Amino acid sequence: MFHPRRTIKALLLPLAAGLALTSLPAQTAQAASTLTNGGFETDGAGTGTPSGWSEYGDTGASFSESGGHGGSYRLSHWASSAYKVETYQYLSGLTNGNYKLTAWVRSGGGQNAAYISLKNCGGTEQRTNLPVSASGWIRIVVPVNVTNNQCTISINSDANAGNWINVDDLTFTSGTSGTSIHGADISSLAKSEAKGGVYRNSSGTTGDPVAVLKSAGMNYARLKVWVNPADGYNTKTQVLATAKRIKAQGMKLLVDFHYSDFWTDPGQQAKPSAWSGHSYSQLKTDVYNHTYDVLNALKAQGTTADMVQVGNEINGGMLWNEGSTANWSQLAGLLNSGYDAVKAVNSSTQVALHLAKGGDLAGTRSWFDSAVAQGVKFDVIGLSYYGYWHGSLYDFQTTLDDAAARYGKPVYVAETAYPFRLGSEDSHEDVIDLSSELVSGYPATVAGQTRWMNDVASIVEAVPNGRGLGVFYWEATWTAVTGNGWDPTDASSGNAWENQALFGYDDRALASMSWFSHR
């Protein structure tokens, strides 16, 4: 990557403003061994306490109404003044073990808190926040390990006047969920440190940024590799050196091959200068040799790559013009050369194909349908998803789910990010620097950045059949350091990304790193 209704009804009961939601009674008259009325269809619209459910707090703010996800009705939370309400159901007589709650939700955003949790299950309460999605329904999951034969399903809102949520089609079944990749791209790190970049933990103590990220929960690092860039960075040499640091922290490694001397993305896929003028047949050999050389060197030093991207954001192909999607048979040959080189070094290394189409269902289908038809070999699907460019969270979930199901492959977010503030640290304009460019419901604050990452991770976690692997944050360490700009041919260029790093303008680790601890 680089740069470039809710219907209103009269309240049924007076609101008891300000009641806390933490003193839920230990049990209720609604105890059952299976979830009752998870689709809110039993009572119809206008019911203050749907069958099977109980309420606590400002109870008039919780009610059923028309406009369900799968049926005719849904549960809604809304009030014309600030409110706190919990809609819950107590389950007893459960067989101990792993369970998963699935729910379809919508939210207008703006609440102090809006989440679904599983609690009183014998262990730590598990929560999933409701992503902001004012129109499309989003599926979320909440996993729990029941150890005391009971569990409480809890739908919570701590909201300001006019805030709303919709919830529908809840199921509570055996199973579990979670993601295995809590990662970040740190390709900028080597040059940053060479140019004087400093990184601190949240207390302000200078330290190794790889260790700081690891301590926050990061478990996978992504490094890009260029062939012969003008500034000498992001080469095999830097990848080998940084890989040692990554593996020393017990993290896994993804190597992202651009097959270029410069950034590759949907708008540019230039061949390396050393490969200029090569025939298509020679380019296939170039791809194989370059891929094998870098990966074999990593293996030789004990830092074998765990995953490899053959190409970066290859919407239009790679190694233009020979590898353009205008000539799919040639693109397939190049991609398969990369795949074969990866497997020749280590058969266990997973090979990913990466598109910048995280919210583009039709585009993702078209591309991968062509890849499959041409016999392209791959193990994993990676998608870039930046909410300010690539569509809504609903679009994102629809695309991700479809890719996993249609091709039977695991999926992951290869790149995403979000600003923690507006306004550049240096004199260079940032990529996202206006409030009008933000995703609705997600402010440019540390809290907004944290919420964005957790909500993206929740959507990946909810991919059916456990095919959602996780998320990579893009360029967590790209702070504003003179000389470490986006253009390797221009030392005066800024990076335009420092307001989306995971280290602040004071070089301290941001609280938003907490997203690495997402399930």
Language-model segments: which ranges?
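Extracellular glycan-recognition surfaces and repeat-rich motifs
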Residues: 33, 39-82, 208
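Extra-cytoplasmic beta-strand recognition segments
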Residues: 40, 84-111, 140-144, 169-170, ...
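Beta-strand acidic-aromatic groove motif in beta-rich domains, primarily in extracellular
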Residues: 48-52, 85-87, 109-120, 151-155
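Extracellular carbohydrate recognition
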Residues: 84-85, 158-174
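Extracellular carbohydrate recognition and processing domains
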Residues: 121-150, 160
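Aromatic-rich peripheral "rim/lid" segments of glycoside hydrolase catalytic domains that contact
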Residues: 194-197, 402, 421-455, 459-467, ...
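Glycoside hydrolase catalytic-domain groove-lining segments
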Residues: 209-210, 344, 350, 363-439, ...
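Active-site cleft segment of glycoside hydrolase catalytic domains centered on the general acid/base Glu
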Residues: 235-238, 265-378, 391-400, 406, ...
